[in-house]
Amino acid sequence: MCGKSLLCVASLLASAYLVYCTQYVTVFYGVPVWRNASIPLFCATKNRDTWGTIQCKPDNDDYQEITLNVTEAFDAWDNTVTEQAVEDVWSLFETSIKPCVKLTPLCVAMSCNSTTNNTTTTGSTTGMSEINETSPSYSDNCTGLGKEEIVNCQFYMTGLERDKKKQYNETWYSKDVVCESNNTKDGKNRCYMNHCNTSVITESCDKHYWDAIKFRYCAPPGYALLRCNDTNYSGFEPKCSKVVASTCTRMMETQTSTWFGFNGTRAENRTYIYWHGRDNRTIISLNKYYNLSIHCKRPGNKTVVPITLMSGLVFHSQPINTRPRQAWCWFKGKWREAMQEVKQTLIKHPRYKGTNDTKNINFTKPGRGSDPEVAYMWTNCRGEFLYCNMTWFLNWVENRPNQTQHNYAPCHIRQIINTWHKVGKNVYLPPREGQLTCNSTVTSIIANIDVNSNQTNITFSAEVAELYRLELGDYKLIEVTPIGFAPTREKRYSSAPVRNKRGVFVLGFLGFLATAGSAMGAASLTLSAQSRTLLAGIVQQQQQLLDVVKRQQEMLRLTVWGTKNLQARVTAIEKYLKDQAQLNSWGCAFRQVCHTTVPWVNDSLSPDWNNMTWQEWEKQVRYLEANISQSLEQAQIQQEKNMYELQKLNSWDVFGNWFDLTSWIKYIQYGVYIVVGVIVLRIAIYIVQLLSRLRKGYRPVFSSPPGYLQQIHIHTDRGQPANEGTEEDDRDDDGYDL
């Protein structure tokens, strides 16, 4: 008896546990959760008058940053923001300079001879070691800038007259042609244009300027940008604890140069180094206290001579000049002090494992055999490509004895340029006529750190893309995923719709991210306001993008921004519709907290509502999302079936429905069906009974009787009874009187 009682009690307890302790999936909309993303960004700028920024969104500096109490991983090299910057700047650069005509006709044999009175690049050591604004060299050609060795070539091609060959004269730098050593005739060598058979070469159609463009990147609606705000961030940080969120990056300027970065926006009153997480690539931000700058100048005049190769094809050449090396660059500022601080900062870097003696840390040039863009400092000055030999400058910075030291570098302008982002070569027009000058602020150094046992070399690099690792490497693009799952004991939820107060304070799109560092319980209490903030921000960003698209309908093909802006808007709409469609498929449309009937899949996995953030919880349940989503969809399908059946029953609950005309027509229809059914049933029953009687030998009642003779019974006379009075009474009823 006692055992049965215990069993009953245990059963009751188990039932109560299943009823009250079972947890169900609850859908939350508006939670501060995100994932890494790689969608196209769009641009914003203040100056929309230039061709490169006319399609950008107007910049109003209204980009507040919100501090997040979270920890995130940042990597300047594995970063979609920096990759997009490199691709976009390259597209703008290529569109601006416009190389377009293939020069395969120049891959012909040429008869060349060297010009006279040529000197080597750095053979002259005369002149002042340092110059400034008041020096004569600043306004004229600097003494000591050697002449570039050039060659004068002749070749024959079919010109406008197809049946005749015409002789052409062309001047090349000696490094732009390759000559056969054992093939000389009359003191002339047989030469070809260098690299003509190894790359696709194009020539510029017209002369264009490459002006720097200032812009910032902005995330589409539904996305955001996180930034590591840690001063010790060095380009790779798996756990950055000082994170801020924004919709746009800082303002940046397009840069295209090797060795140095010009006019960057990351310069501070300190020197810091971004170091690649897996190799020796670095980008060094220079201290702006030292006022480092570069001033480049091309004195004198130049003339351009067009050469008609054939109908519709013109190659632009320049005549032999007594001073082919046309440019030089002067470095201003406290360069020696700045370079010394770079060495000291390198020693303190956590990844540095070399010598601690700054005397054994040297700035060096790349090795021989490198491309010209690597061996020389390459930059663009007013549309002209300068190649500067930095030997004198490095000797001056390092104060190397017995070496030629100058704070300026000799430069020359080239026509054949190696593309800095893709493999290939472009041929541009010779320099435009007149004097050219350009001034820039030096803000960074691109270098590789080569560490030996007792010596460290800081070798200058030609990785132009590294400039954008420094500019945008502390950002990362995220996709806001405001839909979250968590287990609760509530099986279903129903309440009257709550009316929103008019005075709700909206922080903007990033307002709900401010609760990312809060506990899950605290963040869940404000989901209504957060979801309204999220939707309001998305609508606001979409409206801004729509304004841009309306103004750029006729200029979508000019720059890369037109396509990216349209793609950003489409991405935003797709994301919003995807979230709403997903909520609707679960039966949770327009609800901030949606309780379901789906049991929680893992009872051992439960959130800590008081101490765990939504981002931390999301990382734990991410592998369950597919199963949860499928279960929610199946439950919603079953719920819709149940609702359909219930709606069919609900039509009989309302008393007024009984008096509906359409209902009465149905009732009459049903009555006719019933009467006809009863008649048919009676006929069927009668036929069955008739058949059963026939089988037993009975005739139907309604059948005609066969002919027969009626028998009349004749009774014999009996004597008259004595008592006649009683005879009448006693006679047989069956008798007949005759």
UniProtKB/Swiss-Prot annotation:
V1, as annotated region: 112-152
Keywords: AIDS, Apoptosis, Clathrin-mediated endocytosis of virus by host, Cleavage on pair of basic residues, Coiled coil, Disulfide bond, Fusion of virus membrane with host endosomal membrane, Fusion of virus membrane with host membrane, Glycoprotein, Host cell membrane, Host endosome, Host membrane, Host-virus interaction, Inhibition of host innate immune response by virus, Inhibition of host tetherin by virus, Membrane, Signal, Transmembrane, Transmembrane helix, Viral attachment to host cell, Viral envelope protein, Viral immunoevasion, Viral penetration into host cytoplasm, Virion, Virus endocytosis by host, Virus entry into host cell
Residues covered by region (V2): 153-196
Endpoints of the signal sequence: 1-21
One GO cellular component, as annotated: membrane
Modification comment: Specific enzymatic cleavages in vivo yield mature proteins. Envelope glycoproteins are synthesized as an inactive precursor that is heavily N-glycosylated and processed likely by host cell furin in the Golgi to yield the mature SU and TM proteins. The cleavage site between SU and TM requires the minimal sequence [KR]-X-[KR]-R. Palmitoylation of the transmembrane protein and of Env polyprotein (prior to its proteolytic cleavage) is essential for their association with host cell membrane lipid rafts. Palmitoylation is therefore required for envelope trafficking to classical lipid rafts, but not for viral replication.
Region of interest: Immunosuppression: 566-582
Disulfides per UniProt: C43-C56, C100-C205, C107-C196, C112-C153, C218-C248, C228-C240, C296-C329, C381-C438, C388-C411
Entry coiled-coil feature ranges: 615-636
Span of the annotated motif YXXV motif: 698-701
A GO molecular-function annotation: structural molecule activity
Annotated region described as Disordered, given as residue ranges: 716-738
Sites marked Cleavage: R502, G503
Renumbered residue ranges of the record's region V3: 296-328
Extracellular side: 22-670
Transmembrane segments: 671-691
Topological domain ranges for the Cytoplasmic compartment: 692-738
UniProt keyword Ribonucleoprotein present: no
Ranges annotated as biased composition (Acidic residues): 725-738
Other notes: Some HIV-2 isolates have been described that can infect cells independently of CD4, using CXCR4 as primary receptor. These isolates may have an exposed coreceptor binding site.
Function comment: The surface protein gp120 (SU) attaches the virus to the host lymphoid cell by binding to the primary receptor CD4. This interaction induces a structural rearrangement creating a high affinity binding site for a chemokine coreceptor like CXCR4 and/or CCR5. This peculiar 2 stage receptor-interaction strategy allows gp120 to maintain the highly conserved coreceptor-binding site in a cryptic conformation, protected from neutralizing antibodies. Since CD4 also displays a binding site for the disulfide-isomerase P4HB/PDI, a P4HB/PDI-CD4-CXCR4-gp120 complex may form. The surface protein gp120 is a ligand for CD209/DC-SIGN and CLEC4M/DC-SIGNR, which are respectively found on dendritic cells (DCs), and on endothelial cells of liver sinusoids and lymph node sinuses. These interactions allow capture of viral particles at mucosal surfaces by these cells and subsequent transmission to permissive cells. DCs are professional antigen presenting cells, critical for host immunity by inducing specific immune responses against a broad variety of pathogens.
Name of the protein in question: Envelope glycoprotein gp160
